[in-house]
C-alpha cells in the first residue's frame, strides 16, 4: 500500500491575498527589528521640504511594511530570515528564496510558510494544500489553532530580538572627547525665548532627492549633502520636535561624516538666554558636547573600505595599462575612497577644533624638536633696505633632522640595556669603550640574542649589579624589540568630562581606567589598544659618527654570535637555497678591503676563526662547498667589495628562471648568516644596479654601517630600509605615500615625525660631542683646529681667471635675461669648472679629468659644453696676449740666449757654501735655490717676494747683491739630475778644471706662468713643518687626481730630498693601495716628512690615518660633509696628537663664494629639497651667489 506523506498545516498558496495577516500582526512586523524604515530615536530625518513635495501615491506606497524588492541578494534574504526564525537548513532556505524573493511581502510570506511547516527531511519539500471543500474540512480547526500558535511565536521572537538589541545597546558606550561653543542662527521663528541650559538636539538632514528636476550624470556619493539642523526636544515621545536653527557650514562639514559613520554623538545645550523669542536669522549660542562612540574604535567598516579601495585602485591600474589611450578619468574617486577621505578630514579637523593634541613620544630631545619647529630665524633680505623677519623653514628642517638622528639615544630600550657587555675573551682580544659595550648590547637585542646578552653582560670585571638583566628587563626588551608602535599612530589622553550632558551610556568601570586612546590621523582610524608592528627584522643601522669605531663594534658583534646556533647544520631551506649559517658577509668599498682584514686579524683571538676575501673568481662560482661543508675551516667572515657584487649580478641578471630567481652562482648561491654593508650610503639610490644587486643577496641578519645615512635627500633612507626588509616601509608605494609625497608637499614636521618613528627601533647614532651618563665626553679626542688660509693669485693666474670669469658672468646674465637659464645650464657649469681649474693650476684647464664628470649634470645637453674642448688653445691665447702686453726686455729672446746665460752659471754654483743674502739661510736646499743671470743664489720664495716688493713700489727689480737689473722671467732653478761637462763645454767653448767630473744637478729656466700659488704655499708650509717637526706625517687632500699629479711633480722637483711622497687615488689596484697605506703608516724615515697625496673619492671615507696629525685641503667642495669626512680620517679614535687642518682658498675667487654655499648648506641642510625641480632651483640660487659682484 502506497502512502502519501502529508503535513497537517495550512499552507498559503502563491495567489493567496497578502491581507491574510491581521492588522495587529502587520503592525508588529512593521515595528520589529527586521523593519528598515523605523526612524524612532534617529538622527536621520527627512527634509521637511521633501515631505511637502511627496504625492499621495508616494505616501500610500510608503505605508507598505517592507518595500518591493527586485532580485534580492541571497545573503540579505538569508540574514533576514535567520534573524527571525534562527537556524534553518540550506535546502529549506533555497526553497524559500526561490519561491518568495521576488514577492512584495517576501519576509512575511517566507516566515509564515516556514512556521506552518516544511518537512526539512523531504528533499522535494512537498506541501499539501487545502481540498476544494476545505471550508467543511476538519483541517479548518487545526488551521486556526496553528495560526494562533504562529502569532504567539512571532510575538515571542520579536520580544527576544528587542531584548537582544537592548542588551547590545547597553554594552555599547560613548565617551566624552570635548565641547564646541558655537554661534548658531535661527531658521524660523520660535514661540518663546531659549533658556540657559535648555537641551536641544542636532539632526542630520538626509534629503530624499538630490538635484531635483535635473538629470544626474553620476552616482550620488557619500557625504554629498552636509546639512545639520537644530531641533527642540519634545516633551512627549510621540512628538517629533521642531526645527529652530542651523550651525555654521564649517562645523557642519566636520560633524556630518562623524554622524554618518556612527563615530560620534552630540548633545546640545543653550549657553546664553535669549531675551526674546527668535526671529529668522537671529543668532544664539550653544555648547555641543562631543562623544566618541564605541563604533568609532571597531575599525570593521574602515577595514572593509580600505580593502575595497585597494581593489578599486588595482583594477584602475590594470585598466590603465590595458588601454593607455582611453579617455577614462582614472583620478575619479570611488565611494569608499570618499569615505576614507571624509573620515580622515573630519577627525583631524574635529581634534583640531577640540584642541586635542597627541602626547609626544618619550624622548629627551622632544623639547628640542619642538623648539626647532617654533623658533623664528632672522635672515638678511637680498634688498638691503628691506629688513624683514621671517621663519626659515629649511633651518627648522635640518634642526629637526639632526634631532631625529639622535632622539633614539635616550629611548627606554637603550636605557634598559647594560653598558658592560663585551665579546668572549677567547674570541675577541680588544677592549671596548663603554659606549661600544652599550652599543653591542643594543646590537644583540636587535638580533634577538637575549640569552647571549645576559651571559656577556655578566662577564665584565666591574661586576656592576645594576647592569645585570632582570626577568622583567628581559621581558621588556623582548616586547620592545619584537613589536613597536606603528609610526603612523599617535597616542591621546581622554579629557576630563566637563560636559553639560552626562551620558547614560558612559564606559564601564574597567574601560574608565584606560586613560588613553590611539588615532591614525592619516586615515582616521581609532583604537583603544596600542597599534604595534610585529617586526621580524634582525639587524639595523649603526650610524655612529665617523671615527667612533663602527668597524670594531661590528667585529665585536660577529665574535659574540659567530654562527647561527639554532640552525641544523647542512639543512636546506624551503626555497632550496643553501644556508651558510657560519659566515658573515661584509661588503665594503675597495679602498677599505685590506683595512677590514687587518682589523679582523687585530681583534681575532680564536685560531679557528678565519677571514676570507672574495674576489669573484671563476674558481668559486659555487660558494656552498666553501661555506657549508662539515670541516672546521669555514670562514666566519667573508669580505668582498661593492664592485664584485655588481659584476656578478651583471653577469647573471639576465639568466633568471621562470620564477624570477637568479642562478645559484657566486654570492647568490647561498644564504648568509649575516650581511654587513660598510659605508652603506653607497646604495642610497634604489634604482642603481649596485643597490639592486645588494637587495638580491640573501641573509638571515642584516646590518648597515654609515656615518652619513642621509646625503642628498630624505629618500636616501628608503634604500637602507628596503635592504633591511623592514615591513611595511620596504614597500616603496607605502614609503612614498607617507614619507616622500608629504615631504614634497612641505609637510615637513609631519614627515619627520614618521621618519623618526620608523628609524627609532632600528637606528643608533652616537657623535663625538655626546656625553656619557657620568657627564664625561663619549670619547676623548685631542683638539682639532681648522684654519682657512687665503692665497693671492699671481699675475698670470689673475689674468686668466678674470678672462674666464667675464665669459661665465656674461653667460649667466644672458640666461637670466632671456629666461632660458636651464638651457644654458651645462655651459655655465663648464665655466664654473674652468674657474675652479684656474684656482688650482692653469695646466688643469681643458684637461680631461674627473672634475668634468662631477660638475656637469648628466641629464643636461652637453652640446654647448663640447664647445670648450679647445680650452688649451684659449689658455695659450690668453697667455700670449699677456706676454705681448709686457716688456719684451724682461724675457730671453730665444733658447740660444737662454743657453748662453745658463751654462756659464754651472761653474759659479757651490751647493755647500751657498747662502741666501735675503734670509741668510745657508746652505740653500737644492730644490729651493734660484739663480739670477749675474750668478747670485737666493731662495726662490725670497727672490719672488723681492720682485713683488719692488713692483709695489713701482721700482725696477735689481739684484740685492750687485744691483744689476733682474727679471722673474730670467731666473734659473736647480733639480736633481746629472749634467755632463761635455754638454757645458759644447755650449760655452771653455775648458773645465775636471772634464771627467759631471755636475750632480741641472739648471732650468723658471717659468712663473706655469706655477701655482697654492702649490707654492703648500711647499712653504711643508718646509716650515720640516724644520719644526722633521718626522711629521702629512696628508694632502684634493678632489682631483690630475691635480695630485701636478703636486707630486712639483714636490719631487723642489723638495724631494727632505720629503717622502706617496700618492693614493682611484687609479691604483687593491694591492697597490694596501702597500701605500702600509708604507705610510708603518715605515719611518729619519728626519724626513712623509706626505700622502690622497684623493677624496678613493680615500675620503673609511680609512684610518691616525698616524698623521697635519692635513692640507687643496680645494673646497660643494658639500661640507665631504670635507668633514676627510678630516675625520685623522681625527678619530686612536689619534694621540692635536690635529691641524689648513684649507687653501684663493682670495676674491669662486672658492670664497663656495665657502658661502657650504655655510648655506649647513644652515638649510642638504637633505631638505626632495624634488628635482626644487634641487635645480637651489642650484640656480647657488649660481647667483657665485656670480654676484663683490
From Swiss-Prot:
Protein role: Probable helicase, member of the UBC2/RAD6 epistasis group. Functions with DNA repair protein RAD18 in error-free postreplication DNA repair. Involved in the maintenance of wild-type rates of instability of simple repetitive sequences such as poly(GT) repeats. Seems to be involved in maintaining a balance which acts in favor of error-prone non-homologous joining during DNA double-strand breaks repairs.
Sites where the protein binds ATP: 544-551
Organism (species): Debaryomyces hansenii (strain ATCC 36239 / CBS 767 / BCRC 21394 / JCM 1990 / NBRC 0083 / IGC 2968) (Yeast)
Position of sequence motif DEGH box: 678-681
Transmembrane regions listed in the UniProt entry: none
Name of the protein in question: DNA repair protein RAD5
Region described as Disordered: spans on this chain: 1-41
Subcellular location: Cytoplasm; Nucleus
GO biological process, one term: DNA repair
Residue ranges of domain Helicase ATP-binding in the record: 531-727
An annotated Gene Ontology molecular function: helicase activity
Residue intervals of the Helicase C-terminal domain: 1017-1181
Keywords: ATP-binding, Cytoplasm, DNA damage, DNA repair, DNA-binding, Helicase, Hydrolase, Metal-binding, Nucleotide-binding, Nucleus, Zinc, Zinc-finger
EC number, as in UniProt: 3.6.4.-
Zinc fingers (RING-type) by residue: 916-963
Family according to the record: Belongs to the SNF2/RAD54 helicase family.
Superkingdom in the source lineage: Eukaryota
The keyword Cell wall biogenesis/degradation is annotated on this UniProt entry: no
